[in-house]
Each structure stands twice: as C-alpha cells, then as structure tokens.
Regions:
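Short, glycine/serine-rich, charged loops/turns that create anion-binding
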Residues: 23, 27, 68, 103, ...
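Amphipathic alpha-helical segments in well-structured domains
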Residues: 36, 82, 188-192
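Bacterial carbohydrate/catabolite-sensing allosteric modules
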Residues: 45, 49-50, 87-91, 130-134, ...
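Alpha-helical recognition/docking segments in bacterial nutrient-uptake
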Residues: 59-163, 227-229, 243
Length: 274
C-alpha cells in the first residue's frame, strides 16, 4: 500500500498541510529545523515518493548525495538541494533513484543520467562518467575537469556580506566549515577564502576570530562557544552555512547575548527556517 502524506503527518504529529509544504519546499513556510528534519526523516523511513505531475519519459536519473542518509539530517542545506533536484526531475517526467554516500555501488549500469550533489573526489567522478556521459555536479566547481556543474555565486554573496559587515562593525569573526571530498581530501571553501580576503583588504582580519569546525549544528555551536570564551572583542560573526548558524545562535542565546545589539550574525544559504 502506497505511503500517503497523512501517514507521515500522523507519525510526525503535524498537520497534513505542513507535511505537504515541507516536502514541496514551500519558501513561504515558517517551520523549525527540528520539525523539518522530523518530517523528512519519516518520509525517508517510509520510502515516500511523490507522484510526478508530468508524463514519465522512461529515463532514469540517479540523484547522488555525498552524505549518508543519517548525516544529511544534520545539514538542512544539502537535504533541501537533494529534495528540490528530485522534485524538478520528477516534474520533468524522469524516474529518479536516490543514492547516498554509503550505497553508491547500487547505481545501475544502464542509468541515463547522474546528478551528483556535493564534493566528490576525481576518482568518484570518473566512475560516474563511466556509467553515463550525462553527469552534472551540484555545489562543487568541477569545470576544470570538463564536467557540467551548478553552484551559487559564493564570491558575490560573501563579498556583499563582507561589505555590509565591514561598513558597520569593527571586530568581525568568521565561522567556516571543514569539508572533505569522498576520498578524504580537504576542500577549501571559497566562502571562507573570499570573506577572509575581504577582511584583509580593509585591515579587519584577526586570525583569532576565525574558527573552522564541521559543517553541522554542533560544529557551529562549538565554534561560537570558542569565540565567546576568547579574549578578543567581537561585534559581528559571519557563518558560512545555515546549519552551523543554528548552532551559533544556540550558543549566543545560552550566553544571553542580544542579537544584533551585542553581536550581529550573518549566515549563508538562505534556508527559510533559520
């Protein structure tokens, strides 16, 4: 028997409308990160799939997430990207299969296309190309390797944020994320590099106000706790990922810091629930 939205709503303890809007990524919906995670987790556990609105073409696309299903629950950004890619592909009439980091060997040999989300090693990308010439990478610049890719304007966004913060604040911190490719190589985040260069250009760079942790809620929490415990004055903090910003906010609230009166906080990704 097919899983319905009502089944998910009953298990999550929320309304049918909330489930529908979360699973359809309604940008107008205001819901906590915890509720969103719970709904999506239940949908995954029940193997819920949306009915495509367009006529199915018979072609199959593998949506490959560089995280495991468990780790994805800690990063609402990559979860949102993956769900939106699935939705767009299904609406275009494609059949989709979701593949996580720990089961990439399940991608069939006759797959028609692959959308790879995240930071994959060159070796892994080569394996994808051996399966199909139709490979698109999301959120990782691999143009130099001859692959198509889609990613946000990290440089423009970070320069805009840096321009605002350096105009209004003196002591500016940065919480950046540690990312590794699927073979363990560190990826230097262009957001981190761009923001630090902007601070250096206007002589606001203070290495003691830069913290690098895992791109998770806990990572953001730990980094902000370290900044608050340090001897340096702090007026504003740039966080390069919304999941980390959730943790940073928790640390500020625990320290009874008034935002933005005492410390301003800016984060990147624009997840509506942050």
């Amino acid at each position: 028997m097919a899983v319905t939205l009502k089944d998910i709503a009953n298990q999550a303890g929320v309304s049918l409308a909330t489930v529908s809007r979360v699973l359809n990524n309604d940008p107008r919906l205001s819901v906590s990160v915890e509720t969103r995670r719970k709904i999506i987790s239940i949908a995954e556990q029940l193997s819920y799939t949306k009915r495509p609105k367009s006529q199915v073409t018979g072609r199959r696309i593998a949506i490959v997430q560089w995280y495991s299903a468990e780790r994805e629950l800690d990063d609402i950004y990559y979860m949102s990207v993956r769900m939106n890619v699935e939705q767009a592909a299904q609406q275009a009439g494609f059949m989709t299969m979701t593949v996580f980091e720990n089961n990439m060997d399940q991608i069939p040999q006759d797959i028609d296309g692959i959308v790879a989300i995240g930071k994959f090693s060159g070796h892994q990308l080569h394996l994808f190309e051996k399966l199909t010439p139709a490979v698109v990478v999301v959120d990782y610049d691999v143009l130099v390797g001859g692959l198509d890719c889609v990613l946000p304007d990290f440089v423009g966004g970070m320069n805009q944020a840096a321009g605002y913060l350096t105009t209004h604040y003196q002591n500016i911190g940065l919480i950046a994320g540690l990312e590794l490719t699927t073979d363990g190589q560190r990826v230097r985040d262009v957001r981190e590099k761009t923001f630090l260069n902007a601070l250096k250009d206007c002589e606001r760079y203070n290495p003691k106000l830069v913290k690098v942790e895992n791109y998770t809620v806990d990572g953001g929490y730990k980094a902000m706790k370290e900044l608050l415990a340090g001897p340096e004055s702090l007026d504003a903090v740039m966080v390069t990922n919304d999941a980390m910003a959730v943790g940073a906010l928790r640390a500020l609230h625990e320290a009874h810091v008034v935002i933005p009166d005492q410390i301003a906080l800016v984060s990147f990704n624009d997840i509506e629930s942050v």
